[in-house]
């Protein structure tokens, strides 16, 4: 079996490659990323290509499955650049899958694709995927879900799987996630237990997470199995302010959502940090997901708990952990994080 993976050098992509490499049914893997990494894995060959611009049909020819992970979080101050890769690039991937006659497509959707929903009960995959209007990320995830709806109608012979995970963490993603969401001004020591005196106990601030290795196992099962459709991917427990405070050895302090959003908005507009306020809206609005279908139809079961994945991420952020790929490499930040400052904090991708 030959598998092509776009966005293969990031947090999720590297774990997906490792999971596919271990599967005897997979003979060869083509990893596609904007920049060729130093990482070497058995069965894996690399091609440097941008899904928003490169000719993809030739790269997909002969593949038994394409796993589409490529996605931009930054530059958050360049909306058109995000849309060009996230929506335009996805459309080009789907078109190339059809033209190359690839029989299976596995797409990395997200909890962010869902319309606002409940936090006191879990919803299944039938919940509407209208996204969160104020979130760039959610807008694009919802738009790509619509593209995929059209693709499935026009290409019924292609087996399509959509995975909708919560937040995905691992040790090696520590530096990447710190760069993407906290920026160069936040010291690593701030992620140590006891460093923060309090965490915001904001109403509806409850989220789900999964370890990258467990998410990767879901992708592997989707590739080598016969299932199709959408699948929620998340581990237990749901992370709420009380649990988050316990993990950080901090006190939960009630903070209104409006104050949290205002802080994010002002600091983002001043380019003090790279996360726009839409991420706060997304965190407060998206529903809690029921992952029973993935367990039932994919045979997926997470090995690690959500809080264990979060603690591993915090360790990676504290230690500056990474891996030998451009998105994960701590050295990419440069001395004193100079390369991050040169992006104007959300002005362009690193």
PLM ranges: what are they?
Residues 151-207:
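NAD(P)-dependent short-chain dehydrogenase/reductase
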Residues 81-92, 139-140, 210:
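Glycine-rich NAD(P)-binding loop of the Rossmann-fold in SDR/ketoreductase-type enzymes
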Residues 1-22:
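N-terminal Rossmann NAD(P)H-binding glycine-rich loop of SDR-like oxidoreductase domains
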Residues 38, 48-88, 96, 116:
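NAD(P)H-binding glycine-rich loop region in Rossmannoid oxidoreductase-like domains
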Residues 92-137:
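Conserved Rossmann-fold NAD(P)-dependent oxidoreductase catalytic core, especially the SDR/UDP-sugar
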Residues 186-238:
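Alpha-helical substrate-binding/gating segment
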Residues 215-277, 291, 311-312, 320, ...:
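Mid/C-terminal beta-alpha module of Rossmann-like enzyme folds, strongest
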Residues 134-161:
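Active-site Tyr-X1-5-Lys
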